[in-house]
C-alpha cells in the first residue's frame, strides 16, 4: 500500500478528509489564491475562445498549483501528520 493510499484511507475513516478540505478551501480563499485562479481562467478563455472545460483545467492546473503559498502547504501537511500520529496512537 502506498503512503498516499494510506493517508486517504485513514482520513476517510476518521472523517477528517472533509475537515482538511474545508481548511484548505478557507486558507486558499483567505490568501487570494481563488481570485488568482479565476483570473487565470479568464485569461485562458480570452486567448482561446472555443476552449472546453477539460482543456481549461489542463492548462490552468499547473499554474494554479504553483501559486499555492508554501505556508498553506506546510500547514496542511502538519495537520495530516497530526492526524496520522493520532491514528497510530489509537491503533496501538
UniProtKB/Swiss-Prot annotation:
GO terms for cellular component: DUBm complex; nuclear pore; nucleoplasm; SAGA complex; transcription export complex 2. InterPro entries: TF_ENY2 (IPR018783), TF_EnY2_sf (IPR038212). Disulfide bonds: none annotated. Belongs to the ENY2 family. It is found in: Nucleus, Nucleoplasm. Involved in mRNA export coupled transcription activation by association with both the TREX-2 and the SAGA complexes. The transcription regulatory histone acetylation (HAT) complex SAGA is a multiprotein complex that activates transcription by remodeling chromatin and mediating histone acetylation and deubiquitination. Within the SAGA complex, participates in a subcomplex that specifically deubiquitinates histones. The SAGA complex is recruited to specific gene promoters by activators, where it is required for transcription. GO terms for biological process: chromatin organization; mRNA export from nucleus; protein transport; transcription elongation by RNA polymerase II. The keyword Cell cycle does not apply. Signal peptide: none annotated. Keywords: Activator, Chromatin regulator, mRNA transport, Nucleus, Protein transport, Transcription, Transcription regulation, Translocation, Transport. GO terms for molecular function: transcription coactivator activity. Pfam families: EnY2 (PF10163). It comes from the Eukaryota. Component of the nuclear pore complex (NPC)-associated TREX-2 complex (transcription and export complex 2). Component of the SAGA transcription coactivator-HAT complex. Within the SAGA complex, participates in a subcomplex of SAGA called the DUB module (deubiquitination module). This is Enhancer of yellow 2 transcription factor.
Amino acid at each position: 500500500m502506498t503512503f498516499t493510499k494510506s493517508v486517504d484511507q485513514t482520513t476517510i475513516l476518521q472523517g477528517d478528509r472533509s475537515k482538511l478540505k474545508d481548511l484548505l478551501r478557507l486558507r486558499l480563499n483567505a490568501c487570494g489564491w481563488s481570485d488568482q485562479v479565476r483570473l487565470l481562467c479568464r485569461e485562458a478563455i480570452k486567448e482561446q475562445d472555443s476552449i472546453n472545460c477539460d482543456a481549461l483545467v489542463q492548462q490552468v492546473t499547473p499554474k494554479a498549483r504553483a501559486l499555492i503559498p508554501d505556508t498553506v502547504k506546510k500547514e496542511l501537511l502538519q495537520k495530516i501528520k497530526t492526524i496520522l500520529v493520532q491514528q497510530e496512537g489509537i491503533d496501538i
